[in-house]
Regions:
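Catalytic cores of carbohydrate-active enzymes across secretory and cytosolic contexts
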Residues: 1-585
Length: 585
């Protein structure tokens, strides 16, 4: 498959602001980085000639602690890059704010199921000759102000092109005689990487301005852009005055001439769209929303996925190894899970549940009951995700728990500057206290890859209730599905495609209202929360306790119906066919 699409062996260069490769390696903050890591792992499994570029964050994102009142506090992360990464000898340099900035890199090798190696390069400006300001560019992920962010995005895009050149990876139009590492496609994972197109224009022309339509078209034929943001305010923009300061007036004027600076602000998504031959959203619904935001652009759809082997619980992996020969290299084999006995799936799930509860007791000192129905909610603490919706009517929830025992597991970080997200965590802690001792509720600190795997695999239902249509895709429910954990979710993001009501999970009845004038008057929350309560009380909990075989069927359905499609083996194959192949342009 890969050979037929990439028979000329040209490389794909994948650029992402964050990439999650190891749980304890703080080069990611959330879903974007996790998707990037899963994409690269799948590409390695498929033997795709690919390399990747990101930034090294010496202070990571942040270490989270939550006090008894639910207030989030941020601490500094400390880690040693050499624990996971190997320094490369090659160096590069770029100009930022008129300063020459030296750039070094660290390498991480992903080994696919067939032994194929995919290198990931992390850029680092902690170099002796750099100024303190430039050294700090690779300290914090999503830290600082607009000035800091534009510096980082310049480093990722333009610096990434320079580093790849130093490492021997050159764009297809390069005149180098070495054909072994020619790049046939540059993939921008979100707009943070958009300035790589400026780096390519400079590489193509040898100058910082005066680009012709033909120059832009040459770069456009090499570039692919994936947008993950469903609202205009979520796309990175920077004042043109700041752009002049960081990139230089000549480059800033050229970007204005390219019509990617509406309202005197450099729009990174517009840069990426202008210079890409293929643009996609990350789910069918998200592509529809994106087409309205960018009516001048054709936005295709490639729905996200997860790397099945990475996110499957140990006991479930062993079960799949027993019954599904070849599933690790090709997630499509998960369709044969239809033949796995329900009792074996439930036994493997019980082991995953015990593994989660062991960690909960060690961290929070709370002993959870493995025989009690457990709701899971773990993701970035952002207002639109509504982590506190379950507590909309505490008396109603308590009444349900009086009939059917239940317990709840939460986790998730709020961005340090997101006051609304922080308030959400406070609301969850406050809501948990209001329930009293009848319902055990835990909030686990420092949500990371390993904790994510434990929670998505160890609960009995995965709750997801974002405001529609603000969830571009979401992938945590995909992880739970592969582990036989059904979702109770708003019909948004991937669940629009994945939900077969009462077969693989359940739909929360929730009107779309994100752009309505009565955005948050309480009625919408009441409708959505009542749908959650009603389905828990009338369908889900009675089935779990009184019809365990029927619940087991739902679990198995989620594996063999959702698993074969919502994975990165399928997703990367679609990128190969629709985006990376030069025949797709």
């Amino acid at each position: 498959m890969v050979a037929s699409v990439f028979s000329d062996k040209k490389f794909v260069a994948y650029f992402s602001m964050e990439i999650a490769l190891e749980s304890d390696m703080p080069t990611y903050s959330g879903g974007l980085g996790v998707l990037a890591g899963d994409t690269l792992r799948a590409a390695a499994d498929l033997g795709l000639p690919m390399c990747a570029v990101s930034l090294l964050y010496r202070k990571g994102y942040f270490r989270q602690s939550i006090d008894e009142n639910g207030k989030q506090h941020e601490g500094t992360v400390t880690w040693k890059p050499e624990t996971w990464l190997k320094p490369v000898s090659e160096k590069a340099s770029i100009e930022i704010e008129g300063q020459k900035v030296a750039v070094k890199a660290w390498r991480y090798d992903i080994k696919g199921e067939t032994g194929h190696i995919l290198p990931v390069f992390f850029l680092d400006t902690d170099v002796a000759e750099n100024s303190p300001e430039m050294k700090a560019l690779t300290e914090n992920l999503y830290g600082g102000d607009e000035h800091y962010r534009l510096g980082q995005e310049t480093l990722l895009g333009i610096g990434g092109i320079q580093m790849l050149n130093a490492l021997g990876y050159s764009p297809e139009f390069s005149k180098t005689n070495d054909q072994s590492k020619h790049i046939g496609c540059y993939h921008m994972n979100e707009g943070h990487a958009a300035l790589l197109t400026v780096g390519l224009l400079r590489e193509k022309t040898g100058r910082k301005s005066g680009y012709t339509a033909a120059n832009i078209e040459d770069v456009r034929q090499l570039c692919v852009f994936t947008t993950h943001t469903p609202v205009p305010a979520g796309h990175d923009t920077f004042p043109i005055t700041l752009t002049e300061k960081v990139l230089g007036k000549e480059t800033a004027d050229e970007l204005v001439r390219m019509e990617v600076c509406p309202d005197q602000r450099l729009n990174m998504s517009e840069v990426a769209i202008k210079c890409s031959r293929f643009v996609n959203g990350v789910a069918k619904r998200h592509a529809e929303v994106s087409r309205k935001m960018f009516p001048h652009c054709t936005v295709e759809s490639i729905t996200n996925g997860v790397h099945a082997t990475t996110w499957t619980a140990d006991a479930m992996r062993a079960l799949f190894d027993k019954h599904l020969n070849g599933w690790r290299a090709d997630s499509n084999y998960l369709r044969y899970a239809v033949e796995i006995p329900i009792g074996e799936i439930q036994s493997a799930h019980k082991e995953a549940k015990k593994a989660l509860f062991k960690v909960i007791e060690a961290r929070n000192g709370v002993a959870m009951d493995a025989d009690t129905f457990t709701i899971g909610f773990a993701r970035r603490a952002a207002e639109y995700k509504r982590a506190d919706l379950l507590f909309q009517n505490p008396a109603r929830l308590q009444a349900i728990a009086g009939k059917f025992p239940l317990q709840i597991v939460f986790a998730g970080k709020a961005h340090p500057k997101d006051m609304g997200g922080k308030k959400l965590i406070e609301n969850v802690i406050k809501g948990a206290k209001a329930l009293g001792a009848n319902i055990k509720v835990v909030y686990l600190e420092n949500y990371d890859m390993e904790l994510g795997r434990l929670i998505t695999t160890g609960v009995d239902v995965w709750l997801n209730n974002p405001v529609k249509p603000l969830e571009a895709s979401g992938t945590s429910g995909m992880k739970s599905a592969i582990n036989g954990v059904p979702s109770l979710s708003t019909l948004d993001g991937w669940w629009v495609e994945g939900c077969v009501h009462n077969i693989v999970g359940w739909e929360i009845e929730d009107p779309a209202y994100a752009f309505a004038s009565d955005k948050d008057d309480g009625r919408h929350r009441d409708v959505a929360s009542e749908s959650i309560y009603r389905q828990l009380e009338q369908t889900i909990l009675p089935m779990y306790y009184k019809e365990p075989v029927r619940y087991g069927e739902i679990m198995r359905n989620s594996i063999f119906l959702n698993g074969p499609f919502f994975n990165t083996h399928r997703m990367v194959t679609q990128y190969l066919q629709l985006a990376y192949s030069m025949s797709a342009k």
